[in-house]
Curated annotation (Swiss-Prot):
This is Glycerol kinase. Activity of this regulatory enzyme is affected by several metabolites. Allosterically and non-competitively inhibited by fructose 1,6-bisphosphate (FBP) and unphosphorylated phosphocarrier protein EIIA-Glc (III-Glc), an integral component of the bacterial phosphotransferase (PTS) system. Coiled coil: none annotated. It comes from Enterobacter sp. (strain 638). It holds the Pfam family FGGY_N. Belongs to the FGGY kinase family. Its EC number is 2.7.1.30. ATP binds at residues 14-16, 268, 311, 315, 412. GO terms for cellular component: cytosol. Key enzyme in the regulation of glycerol uptake and metabolism. Catalyzes the phosphorylation of glycerol to yield sn-glycerol 3-phosphate. Keywords: Allosteric enzyme, ATP-binding, Glycerol metabolism, Kinase, Metal-binding, Nucleotide-binding, Transferase, Zinc.
Amino acid sequence: MTDKKYIVALDQGTTSSRAVVMDHDANIVSVSQREFEQIYPKPGWVEHDPMEIWATQSSTLVEVLAKADISSDEIAAIGITNQRETAIVWERETGKPIYNAIVWQCRRTAEICEKLKRDGMEDYIRSTTGLVVDPYFSGTKVKWILDHVEGSRERAKRGELLFGTVDTWLIWKMTQGRVHVTDYTNASRTMLFNIHKLDWDDKMLEALDIPRAMLPEVRKSSEVYGQTNIGGKGGTRIPISGIAGDQQAALFGQLCVKEGMAKNTYGTGCFMLMNTGEKAVKSENGLLTTIACGPRGEVNYALEGAVFMAGASIQWLRDEMKLISDAFDSEYFATKVKDTNGVYVVPAFTGLGAPYWDPYARGAIFGLTRGVNSNHIIRATLESIAYQTRDVLEAMQADSGIRLHALRVDGGAVANNFLMQFQSDILGTRVERPEVREVTALGAAYLAGLAVGFWQNLDELQEKAVIEREFRPGIETTERNYRYSGWKKAVKRALAWEEHEE
């Protein structure tokens, strides 16, 4: 046990950077958040400015301590959780990026993925990395940068350039370029990492022509990686001692550390993870096999289903369609109609993730008749989040052989009671919403705290996992299956849309 009172979690997300201070009882003392720019150079392309990621994240760290009136010497450790797969390449000497960060949602590398498939790499990638061939993962993004920034591949071979996911980039900046590391959970999302041998995979590096010299060292999710100075020169040196990709951090924050426990996070995308313990379960149903954290941050495996558009489809209603002025209004408008009037929205704006994995699917609205109004479309958009979650859960139960009795949920959209009730209805299972919604930050804080003895073990934290509300199914099985079959019909029609274009 340390005499320091607080842990800081840095939660670097897709649309904002956050810092959260927690005390020993896992209470949230203070939160600071800053949004940053989304860059869309072409349709289907998504970028961030790595310097803006760093600027927003470092300023929230200073801000959150000031807000809580806490001095840096009261902080026991810092944990980091991050948007996964997003790829950054920078100069070792200057710490300057050679290109913008290519974000996980970006589809520009679809052609590179097609070539990997043509070269017969699909099965190898599946069995070695646990992933499917898709532009979502970091490997093809790094290749794209090296292919398009002149002279960069040669510089990378000479050790002048470094690659990292967002966790690696932040730690490099926080340690003034002294530490170049990532953790197993983030490495498992690159398509360059052998999840069984726990090492970078030479065959994948060769296939994508990525020099090994630019890759970070891979470490456990809970250990001291280095120190950062808060308050400039002569400030306090604080250990950075926890790293996990956002979804694995949420799984840990929900204390799903035993085989068969699962959670679904409703953020920009929707991510369901089920802990499968020490065995890597190969999916026959389009899910990913990935690395998660055991009770001490050690390597466990998980099955994951990723849905690209969840909260992002509500933002689409607000920003592009102008049907709502605030995301919170979606619940109000959805409940003004008794159903969707036969409408299904398939929000395949950047293709579809699990279990379809079709980068060429595109968004569509089906079942429109003259009586359909904006409330029906708002409701159908919310319902699409629950339908996509059922797609993933069905695949997960088939792969694992485990029937889920309750789903733990977290993320921004779980505040929407309509969505949570519909989710329970369409799954036919209990949905449990925790009291503390910041489970991603919680996971990063737990990992950091365990590494420095702030908490001795997870047993100390079990009683803190309080369920605020439980949703139970309120519709009959026949009704549930009827609605779901309509969804399946709609999805089928949205698949493989784009590749027919000239």
